[in-house]
C-alpha cells in the first residue's frame, strides 16, 4: 500500500478489532520477528537519526531477503542506506535522509534515486510527526503550517491546502500514516510488550498507535514487577504490541540512550567506504557485516570488543554523571 493512501476510520476500527490485545507473553526470536514483516508492507521505523534505531531487525530483514517495502521514519540515517542497498525497501518516507549528523546527505540514497530504482519521499519533520499522530488518532489528516510556501509543496500533492473555517487562514492538511507494522527499539520491556523508553521518545508513541502491528526489539526483557515499579516510564502499552525480541546492543552501531553511544570508528569506516563507491562499497559492507556473520552476536564481534566497551562507557557516563 502506498504511504499516501489514507484508510477510513471504519477500516482502522475493523483491523483493530481483529488484533489479539490480550495480556500474553510475546517473546520471539529475531528471525521469527523478521518473518512477521512480509514483502510489500509499509513499515514504520522508530527512533530518529542514529538513536534507538532497530538495527538488528533491519539487519535480519536484509538477511531474509525482504523486498518492496515502503519504510517511513522521522529522520533516516545509515539504516536507510542499508534498506536501499540491501534491496529491502523500494521507497523511504522521511524528513531528512543523511548518513548521520557528521556526514551529510546519503550518497547511497542519491545513487539509487537518480538511477530511478528507488524513491525518496520528503516531508517536513513536523509533517512526519503529524502524519503518525493522525494515524494514531484514527483521523484522516491533521492541519499544519509547516511546508506552506516551501519547495516541498510541489513535490507533495498528497498534502492539500485548506482555508480554515474559523480564521480564513491557509493551512496544509497532511494525510494520516498508518504503517502495516512498526519496528521500534527500546531500553527495556516485559514479556507482554510493556515498553519503557529513556530519553527522547521521538515519534514512537504515535507510531505504535498508528501501526496495525508492532514489533519491539529491546536491550533486555525485565519482569512485569519492575515495569510496575516505574509506571511513568512505560510509553508503549502491551495491547499495542505483537512481538518482543531481546537483542542486546540491538541499535548498534547507532546509540541507545543511557546504555551506549554510537560506535564511531565503525560508522566512520562505513561512511568512507560507501561514499567512495555507493554500489561496490555497499556490496562489500553487506557481504562482510550482514551476510557474513552467523548471528547478531557475531556481527557485534566484527565491530570489536574495544569499540563496544568504549561506546558503553560513554553512554553510561553521560547518563549517570
PLM segments and residue spans:
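Conserved alpha/beta enzyme-core scaffold
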Residues: 1-321
Amino acid at each position: 500500500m502506498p504511504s499516501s493512501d489514507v484508510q477510513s476510520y471504519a477500516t482502522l476500527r475493523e483491523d483493530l478489532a481483529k488484533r489479539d490485545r490480550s495480556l500474553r507473553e510475546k517473546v520471539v526470536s529475531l528471525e521469527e520477528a523478521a518473518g512477521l514483516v512480509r514483502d510489500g508492507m509499509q513499515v514504520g521505523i522508530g527512533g530518529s537519526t542514529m538513536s534507538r534505531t532497530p538495527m538488528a531487525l533491519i539487519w535480519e530483514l536484509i538477511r531474509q531477503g525482504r523486498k518492496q517495502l515502503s519504510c517511513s521514519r522521522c529522520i533516516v540515517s545509515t539504516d536507510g542506506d542499508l534498506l536501499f542497498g540491501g534491496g529491502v525497501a523500494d521507497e523511504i518516507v522521511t524528513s531528512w535522509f543523511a548518513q548521520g549528523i557528521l556526514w551529510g546527505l546519503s550518497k547511497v540514497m542519491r545513487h539509487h534515486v537518480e538511477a530511478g530504482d528507488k524513491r525518496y519521499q520528503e516531508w517536513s519533520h513536523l509533517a512526519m510527526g503529524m502524519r503518525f499522530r493522525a494515524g494514531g488518532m484514527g483521523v484522516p489528516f491533521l492541519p499544519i503550517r509547516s511546508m506552506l510556501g516551501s519547495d516541498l509543496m510541489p513535490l507533495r500533492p498528497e498534502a492539500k491546502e485548506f482555508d480554515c473555517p474559523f480564521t480564513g487562514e491557509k493551512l496544509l492538511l497532511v494525510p494520516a500514516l498508518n504503517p502495516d507494522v512498526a519496528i521500534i527499539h527500546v531500553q527495556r520491556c516485559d514479556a507482554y510488550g510493556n515498553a519503557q523508553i529513556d530519553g527522547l521518545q521521538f515519534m514512537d508513541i504515535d507510531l505504535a498507535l498508528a501501526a496495525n502491528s508492532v514489533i519491539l526489539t529491546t536491550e533486555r526483557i525485565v519482569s512485569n514487577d519492575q515495569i510496575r515499579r516505574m509506571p511513568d516510564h512505560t510509553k508503549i502499552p502491551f495491547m499495542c504490541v505483537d512481538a518482543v525480541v531481546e537483542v542486546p546492543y540491538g541499535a548498534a552501531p547507532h546509540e541507545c540512550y543511557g546504555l551506549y553511544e554510537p560506535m564511531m570508528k565503525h560508522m566512520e569506516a562505513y561512511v568512507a567506504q560507501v561514499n567512495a563507491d555507493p554500489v561496490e562499497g555497499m556490496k562489500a559492507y553487506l557481504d562482510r557485516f550482514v551476510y557474513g556473520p552467523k548471528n547478531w552476536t557475531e556481527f557485534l564481534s566484527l565491530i570489536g570488543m574495544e569499540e563496544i566497551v568504549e561506546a558503553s562507557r560513554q553512554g553510561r557516563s553521560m547518563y549517570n554523571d
